[in-house]
Amino acid sequence: MEPQAKRKKEMDDYDDTWEVLPVLSDEQSQDPELLPAYAAPILERRETSRLVKELSLIHPLPNLQHIKRVRPCKHKDSPHPLEVIVCLVSDVQCTDPKKVTLSHLLHTQCFNSNGLGDPFIVQIPANPPLTRPQFEKASKHWPTSFHEDKLVTFALKGQLFTAHQKTKMREYMCVAVKAAKSGRELGMDAVGAVIVDPKTEQIIAVAHDCKRGSHPLHHAVMVCIDLVACGQDGGAYNYEKYPACRFSCSNSVCDGKETGLPYICTGYDLYVTREPCVMCAMALVHSRISRVFYGASTADGAFGSRYKIHCQKDLNHRFEVFKGVMVNACEDLCKE
């Protein structure tokens, strides 16, 4: 008896345990940069206010406004209750920072060091934290202020989108996966893309990779953008020989032909099975896409994996990027 052929996975075989996570800038996602500083124990709590005031005059920290000058002692059995930042290590010239005394740091006879103990070196965050994970890591070194962006916090927890929104995301990505499989049957790379109007929840364009057929630059994202342009009486190419690549005239697009359309992809979302390359990412910038959702990451990806083009401050358009939508199904496309 011949063994039964392995059945290909259908979309219903994939569970819904995936999370939609934001692709943040390096500033938002990197670990806190640390600076060495001198701290000293405050031996008498009643001297705290005076010491902080006088230290701020001798050693102001103008670029470290996020740092709290005083912290409670970490050890409950410590003989001193508080510790205070005296100055940065870089503010004092000394051949051996570990042998520095208060007289080295407080280079003035006007300072009353009563209530201040011997200095020691600590690491303090160089920049204010931008996300809660950064804040939690920074606070392990020294207390810092934090102005939380609630939307970023919800996004990092996978709580930014409602159940209905996630259901629609799955629906759109399933269409992209189906398009990718149609392209693969034609000998193309298995990559699919869908452009959606989030206001109407209607699909505007569907495309798969065509670069091995009509043109070497016809990546799935490029084809999808061009299809939207074609629907706005623009576009540069014809995709009739690829029936899975199509434009759908939504109500907003059809009405817009009479009243004037926004520039190409303004206000639209892109769903793509694989993280776009640099060329496609720049095309998304120029087409004014609103948001990008991708499934599988790639080593040379232009967003989360390597370049983070959507976060470049010198570009004249930026947009939000999310990853992880139907990640298993999208990764299987790469394997197959």
UniProtKB/Swiss-Prot annotation:
Alphabetically ordered keywords of this record: Metal-binding, tRNA processing, Zinc
Location of the CMP/dCMP-type deaminase domain: 167-322
One Gene Ontology CC term in the entry: cytoplasm
Domain of life: Eukaryota
Cofactors (names): Zn(2+)
Coiled-coil ranges from the UniProt annotation: none
GO molecular function, one term: metal ion binding
Entry binding sites for Zn(2+): H219, C277, C280
CDD domains the UniProt entry points to: nucleoside_deaminase
Family: Belongs to the cytidine and deoxycytidylate deaminase family. ADAT3 subfamily.
UniProt-recorded name of the protein: Probable inactive tRNA-specific adenosine deaminase-like protein 3
Species assigned in the record: Danio rerio (Zebrafish)
Primary gene name: adat3
